[in-house]
Amino acid sequence: MKSIGIDTVIGIRSGYRKFITYPSPYLLKKGCYMPSVDLLDLFLRLAGKYGMKFYFGLYDSGEYWDTGDMSHEVEHNKYVIDEVWNMYGRKYESFGGWYLSGEISRATKGAIGTFHALGKQCKEVSGGLPTFISPWIDGKKAVSNAQNAVTADEHEREWDEIFDGIHDVVDACAFQDGHIDYDELDLFFSINKRLADKYGMKCWTNAESFDRDMPI
């Protein structure tokens, strides 16, 4: 990875439901399984060895996917953020930032408040390290929405509102590129860049290089 110029590594999430990547005192008490390897420590050590920065992805309890309400994730992650910073962030210079791992595509219930609360806490505990989100675009390739793809105007209107509510604590947005058709990329990505510039955010791309032509 280093030899081809990769300088940043992002952990997509530190856990999903009962499976976690590090021995979290809080999550173990909540019934999560003890991991056989402390992957977070491993990733941070290797990132430091090769001069890379590692972005920590927050915990996903699965409650958002079950209920459609993102606000459930704040309660769990307020403990995860504090313990991860104390256990790893203070120890490793390779700890470079935070990935707010809740994935949305549109004006989801609780999204603005959740991203703002989590982004604010991440920055406060770490002395202002960068934060980012990686939503998808609700296009024709989206598994759950193939018949009701979002229009460009709807996408711009809804994300204008979301960015307005989070830009002070979220530094970058990396939209996933795999849910819209190839000939729609320029239009939607132009909107993304325009909105990011408007709110002083960085506009990244989550290049999804896997096929979507097989059942999940």
Predicted features and spans:
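Glycan-processing catalytic domains of CAZymes
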Residues: 1-216
